[in-house]
Amino acid sequence: MNTSPGAPTGVRAFVDSQPIGRRQRIIVLMVFLIMVADGMDITLASHLFPPVIRDWGVPVSAVTLVVSLGVVAMAIGALVSGPVADRWGRKGVTVVGFVLFCLATAGLGLTGDIHSFAALRIISCFGLGAVMPVALTIVADWMPKARRAQMVSIAFAGVGVGSIIGAYLAAAVIPTLGWQVMVLIAGLAPLIILPFFVALVPEPAIISVRRGIPEARIRSALALVAPDRDIAGVDLTRAGLTLGAGEVRAKALFAEILCRPLLGVTLLIWGVFFVVQGSGLLVLQYMPMLLQAPAPGLSTVESGLIVAMYGWGALIGQLTIAFILKRFDRFIALAAFIFWSVVGLLIVAAFGTGFGFFGYFTLLFAIGLSLPATAAAMQSVTTLAYEEEFRATGMGSAGFAGRLGTLTYGALGGTLIGAGFGITTVSLVLAAPLAVSIGLVFSLRALSRRAGIAPEPHQITPGNEVDDAHVST
């Protein structure tokens, strides 16, 4: 690609033309570590509330309300953070959200009643909800289109690592030191990441151009990503942001993702996120209880080992799909992983009460390979659906839909178990909307192709990045 002053290149075309370098790998690593903190919170929260109920003598209904308010706060955080990040920058939103999450989580260990506990938990969840979509958007903004889906999925795999670490941390700390020490560790330890993130992760160049940041600072950021390339010919004026159909118009950012040709795409993304994240939450949150029910009647230790194996399956599946997305149609890969999840759940529904420990051990590992990986794939699908100018808004709105899914499925799981239904019925109820979501994925594929949105990563070659980005030079 010519980067001489006589042939100006748009920012996106310049990033797309670069192979992934050392600084981009560092960016992925930093966001991966932030996702680890997110995954730790998911697991630790499930271990946190039983001792809170025991120590303070609060009713289960009060804790249920705290959990529900926390999920709502996550959803609002995701929804609000996207437009703010699109207008004022990704990096600052990520840092503020992460600090809120860490400090509020650590503060839980200093509370003495359910009211102050609930207030801090809501703040913590708001920060956490804001961080995930914006941090993943930073990864997407700095990656070439051909590798964007893969790198976003690898960064998201940190959630799986965090869930495993959280489970072991809870098992080691709570029985000996108490839940207060556990939340102090979970809140303060991730802050170690922050100075490295601030120092090593530059603000995405395209957002800096939109904000009118001095060109010298933007060129410095581009030089970090592509130290061996001449960046003098990169167009850092607003004219260089014109990405064809993705050009931002003078209207609200939410209107951008809800107008044609993106309306149908956005609604389908919301639908799949709702089902996928809700299903994953229900399995993680209620599987120990279902396994310890009279049928199948497993012990606490056995159910714990099975859920841990589900976590390992999740990690392997998320890393696996990251490399699959580099080579194959992302929609086909996503549909295949959802289908595998449906098959596993239907096997449990059909023969669940007849399985012993090893049967569930194997099945839950298999479901872990597929179901959590669909969430990673959806993050990648979403980053490729939206241009940089409103990508964080699209990611945040998808995160909002996913959090609403976790809230709905959490209530559904509690209702089913409270009504006396066991693992076979719950698995069948889970399988049905997942099967429907396969149809949503293929509809999303058709709409995306019709609208000419984000060609498949494997279709992009080094000679056609500029054309794919629709950059005017």
From Swiss-Prot:
MF-aspect GO terms: carboxylic acid transmembrane transporter activity
Topology in membrane: Multi-pass membrane protein
Keyword check for tRNA-binding: no
TM region(s), chain numbering: 26-46, 60-80, 92-112, 122-142, 154-174, 181-201, 264-284, 305-325, 331-351, 355-375, 399-418, 422-444
Keywords: Cell membrane, Membrane, Transmembrane, Transmembrane helix, Transport
Taxonomy, superkingdom: Bacteria
Protein name: Probable 1-hydroxy-2-naphthoate transporter
Organism: Nocardioides sp. (strain KP7)
